[in-house]
């Protein structure tokens, strides 16, 4: 049994009972995801909520206006789907958050014999896509042996359409269920996938699309989004990056022609069809904010859809043309809203119980960096001026970005008297392909260079106290935290790393196969092929240089950042006489249990307070 120093989890963070209740209430307040509905029975919907204290699946009968909790598992359940007729709810059955399992289904109407395997014959694996038709189920899974994509037509039995050692996934099933678009990386670049469209009856190929790399050698990906939702319509909506950012095209399989959509918006785009396939609902992301638009496919007219400034987390168009979407901003807690065809924008679902307390506005900084300005979002505690202790909260991914959205975690750090800085470093999405791909071949050090220039800005602008700067993050952000503590020890007074990559060679050996494929694409090969790149980018390589106290939080069942490589790093800290603590929990890559998230947050703030000495004033 290991003897690592355990992290202290205090009973309270604040002496003021109102402040204590406020921060906890931001986490325990019920939240609801944007609902999905059955295609042919749109009154039947499912959504996820933490109302029970754990994120679980709920059924919503809109006609009867009734809600029912479907799943009840100790470590929660991630998302669900509905059969086309709305009779069955599908959810992914893994073990304690390990993401390895099978799809199961149960009646929408209520519990009967309990959930049963939804697709007899499907192997246990990591999910690689699901698309449900009237008579056809398209399902994918991955294992250490690679990816398998299969169909079951009319209950005739599972039949493999595609199998490969490289990463692949279900893209989209055509409305007439004769074509299946798949995303694949046979070319060895999982970060920039290609598309193949297969005939469902026999698995033969209708067409392939693989964008060749740009002149600078960097890849260009293609992503199948959706077929037009009209029977006989073989138009496939595709995401591309041919002009250096995420844009859209229509690939008509009937004529094998492409039409790139020229949409006059400066940021990255994603979209889906309106129900009659006449238009697209377009999501536009730029500088950490989201706007929504309607793009008419016949005329090319783009119409802005009115939404408040902030971030949209999921959206879809109902049969009547209403747009349902999730929205929040740094100040305003998340809410599921609906934009009616007549222009009314109102709350669709109000979670039960008290609403979480608001927080403060995020401001923007654009800081000159090595390859362009680095975008940072920041906030300081209300009522403060001059330098204050500052948490550099680093996002995961790396293909993700911090946005102007509500965060209970950010809010409690601000309440505790810390400024918060988010850095959308090179590697982040939302700033164009070149920015996202700048870390290829040099991961870790590239992102840290951007974090360093933002750190310098925060200190020089009298936001951050240079003696009280905290490096904090989860997943890839946790990885960058550990790497930063070793490569930039002069910058950081303390570090908190949640579910991090800590020993890259051991992580590669133990992680799920889709992430190995991602790493090969990111690093330029496997550890056998480019060992020095992995060695240089691995936090354990630089552990001797760590000066700051380190808190690590890790899941025992994490398939993405497995526990063995975390233990290797802790052993290296211990051998070097470094100050550290560990919080272990019985789940995977993060927790769906609200009480566990509260423990993590309390442990981080308590650890940082002890490391920095006298606490800043509470707000």
Question: Where are the predicted features?
Answer:
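Beta-propeller blade-edge and WD-like acidic-aromatic loop motif
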Residues: 2-20, 50-69, 94-116, 142-160, ...
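Conserved beta-propeller blade repeats
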Residues: 29-46, 74-92, 103, 115-116, ...
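Short glycine/serine/proline-enriched coil/turn segments at secondary-structure junctions
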Residues: 97-98, 187-190, 217, 356-357, ...
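Cap/lid segment of the alpha/beta-hydrolase catalytic domain
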Residues: 350-467, 472-474, 509-517
């Amino acid at each position: 049994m290991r003897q690592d120093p355990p992290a202290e989890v205090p009973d309270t963070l604040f002496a003021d009972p109102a402040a204590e209740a406020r921060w906890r209430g931001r986490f325990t307040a019920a939240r609801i995801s944007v609902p999905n509905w059955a295609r042919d029975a749109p009154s039947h919907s499912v959504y996820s909520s933490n109302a029970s204290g754990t994120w679980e699946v709920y059924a919503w009968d809109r006609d009867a206006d009734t809600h029912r909790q479907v799943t009840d598992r100790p470590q929660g359940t991630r998302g669900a789907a509905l059969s086309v007729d709305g009779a069955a709810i599908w959810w992914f059955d893994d073990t304690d958050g390990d993401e390895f399992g099978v799809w199961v289904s149960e009646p929408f109407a209520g519990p009967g014999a309990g959930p049963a395997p939804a697709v007899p014959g499907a192997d246990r694996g990591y999910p690689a896509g699901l698309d449900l038709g009237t008579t056809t189920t398209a399902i994918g899974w991955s294992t250490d042996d690679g990816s398998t994509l299969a169909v079951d037509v009319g209950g005739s039995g599972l039949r493999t359409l595609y199998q490969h050692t490289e990463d692949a996934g279900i893209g989209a099933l055509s409305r007439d269920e004769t074509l299946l678009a798949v995303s694949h990386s046979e070319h060895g670049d999982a970060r920039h996938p290609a598309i193949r469209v297969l005939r469902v009856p026999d698995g033969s190929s209708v067409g392939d699309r693989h964008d060749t790399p740009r002149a600078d050698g960097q890849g260009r990906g293609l992503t199948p989004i959706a077929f037009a939702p009209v029977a006989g319509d073989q138009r496939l909506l595709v995401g591309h990056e041919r002009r250096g950012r995420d844009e859209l095209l229509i690939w008509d399989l009937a004529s094998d022609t492409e039409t790139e959509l020229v949409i006059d918006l400066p940021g990255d785009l994603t979209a889906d069809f309106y129900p009659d396939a006449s238009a697209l609902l377009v999501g536009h992301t730029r500088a950490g904010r989201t706007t929504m638009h309607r793009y008419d496919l016949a005329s090319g007219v783009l119409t802005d859809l009115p939404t408040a400034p902030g971030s949209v987390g999921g959206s879809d168009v109902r049969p009547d043309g209403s747009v349902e979407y999730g929205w929040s901003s740094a100040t305003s807690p998340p809410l599921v809203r609906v934009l009616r065809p007549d222009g009314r924008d109102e709350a669709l679902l109000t979670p039960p119980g008290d609403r979480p307390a608001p927080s403060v506005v995020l401001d923007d900084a654009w800081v000159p960096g090595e390859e362009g300005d680095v975008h940072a979002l920041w906030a300081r505690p209300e009522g403060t001026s001059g330098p204050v202790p500052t948490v550099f909260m680093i996002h995961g991914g790396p293909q993700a970005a911090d946005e102007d959205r509500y965060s209970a975690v950010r809010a409690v750090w601000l309440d505790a008297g810390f400024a918060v800085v988010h850095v959308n470093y090179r590697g982040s999405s939302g700033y164009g392909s070149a920015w996202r791909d700048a870390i290829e071949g040099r991961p870790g050090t590239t992102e840290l260079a951007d974090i360093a220039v933002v750190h310098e800005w925060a200190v020089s602008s009298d936001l951050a106290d240079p003696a009280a700067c905290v490096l904090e993050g989860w997943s890839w952000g946790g990885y960058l935290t550990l790497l930063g503590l070793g490569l930039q020890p002069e910058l950081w007074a303390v570090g908190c790393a949640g579910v991090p990559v800590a020993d890259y060679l051991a992580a590669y050996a133990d992680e799920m196969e889709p992430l190995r494929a991602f790493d090969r694409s990111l690093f330029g090969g496997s550890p056998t092929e480019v060992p020095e790149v992995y060695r240089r980018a691995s936090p354990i390589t630089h552990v001797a240089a760590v000066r700051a106290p380190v808190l690590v939080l890790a899941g025992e069942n994490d398939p993405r950042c497995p526990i063995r490589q975390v233990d290797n790093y802790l052993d290296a800290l211990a051998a070097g006489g470094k100050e550290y603590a560990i919080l272990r929990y019985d789940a995977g890559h993060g927790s769906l249990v609200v009480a566990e998230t509260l423990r993590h947050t309390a442990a981080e703030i308590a650890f940082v307070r002890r490391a920095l000495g006298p606490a800043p004033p509470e707000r």
